[in-house]
Structure formats: C-alpha cells, structure tokens
Design a protein with these regions (language model features):
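Crotonase-fold acyl-CoA enzyme core
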Residues: 107-201
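Glycine- (often His-adjacent) and acidic-residue-rich active-site loop
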Residues: 25, 57-105
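Glycine-rich, phosphate-binding/catalytic loops in enzymes
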Residues: 34-36, 69-73, 157
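Conserved CoA-thioester-binding segment of acyl-CoA-metabolizing enzymes
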Residues: 1-58
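Histidine-centered beta-alpha loop that forms part of the nucleotide-sugar donor binding/catalytic region
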Residues: 21, 66, 121
Length: 201
C-alpha cells in the first residue's frame, strides 16, 4: 500500500475510508494531496474487499479549498492522464496543469466503479466542492456550510463547470456571484446533498 502523508486510508467492514488530513491548513488541497487521493481511490476501486468508498476529513472543517501557497510543480509528480505541456510558459502550461490535477483527476473519480459517499462537516469552500461533487452521495452534518468566493478575488475555478450540474444554473450563479454561504439544509433543498445529520452523529 502507498504511504500517505496528507490523507488517512483505512478499510473496515468492506468500507474504504479516505480522510483528508491537513488539519493545520483546514485540509486545503495541494498537489500532493490530490495525487494521494487519486492513489487512495485507485486502491479502493481495485480492492475486491471494498464495496463502498467514504471521503471525509479530520479537523473542524472539511476543506478550505485549493492550497494557494503550494509551490510544487508538475515535475514533482507522475501524471495519470495523457495531457502534456506542463512546463510550457504562461496560460498553456497553466491550462495543462488544470486539465491534469483538477479536471482529469475529478473525471477519473466520477467514474469509479464503486459507490462513493462524501461525509462533510464544517466549511466546504471552493475546491472543497470539487472533491464532494465527484461522489455519488453527499451526507452533511447540520453545521456544514458550502461556499465558493473565488469570483470575488478574481480567480478562475474548474468547480464552475460542475456547479450548474449539481445545483442548477440559477443557484450556481447565485453562489458564484454573491460568494455567500449555503447551509446544509438549503443545500439539500437544491439537490446538492442527501441526508443532513446532527454533527455529533
């Protein structure tokens, strides 16, 4: 089994649990975490003893989004797609990276051959939505909130492409234009989530 430093992987009673574990940065996703998530999803998908995959997080919040302080480059990792051009200057190189670590990985995870469940609590911000959208079911604690404030600080986000699919175009535009938080109960009414459960459970 691979060694993980940004997540925790465990299998109990045919359930693989993948836990985000960068608590000090509120589980912000750097490239290392994304590739470890990919390895963990592959591990669970290929394990005949695993029937269901659960994605959750340690700490007070599910995820604060992408780690904007990540200084690693694509040369530090082994790509899993056939995209190229990561080292090219400007927009071309940046787009290549986005295709691999955001769009490409998410596409792989959406197509896992086993049921996936996101178990979320606390804040789910921007890139945190990217992680839960790929799951078949989303179970939220009653203290969970969802937001995507990236428009407010002028950053593009691949999550944009999934928001209309997950909650409908009008609610997606409201979420992006205002940057306001959506509660777990409100998220459920817009089709963004499934059961809402008490945080202590």
């Amino acid at each position: 089994m691979p060694e993980f430093s940004t997540i925790v992987y465990a299998v109990t009673d045919q359930v693989a649990r993948i836990t985000l574990n960068r608590v000090d940065v509120r589980n912000a996703q750097d490239k290392a975490m994304l590739y470890e998530l990919n390895d963990a999803f592959d591990l669970a998908a290929q394990d005949d003893g695993v029937k269901v995959i659960v994605l959750d997080a340690n700490g007070p919040h599910f995820s604060s989004g992408h780690d904007l302080a990540d200084q690693t480059t694509m040369a530090d990792f082994q790509p899993v797609s056939n995209w190229g051009g990561y080292g090219k200057p400007g927009a071309e190189g940046y787009q290549s990276q986005e295709e691999e670590i955001y769009l490409g990985l998410c596409w792989r995870w959406r197509n896992l051959p086993k049921p996936t469940i996101a178990q979320v609590h606390g804040k789910v911000i921007a890139g945190g939505l990217m992680l839960i959208w790929v799951c078949d079911l989303i179970i939220a604690s009653d203290d969970a909130t969802f937001s995507d404030p990236v428009v407010a600080f002028g950053v593009n986000g691949v999550e944009y492409f999934a928001h209309p699919w997950e909650m409908g175009p009008r609610k997606a535009k409201e979420l992006l234009f205002t940057g306001e938080k959506i509660t777990a109960e409100e998220a459920k009414t817009h089709g963004m989530g499934n059961p809402v459960v008490p945080a202590q459970e």
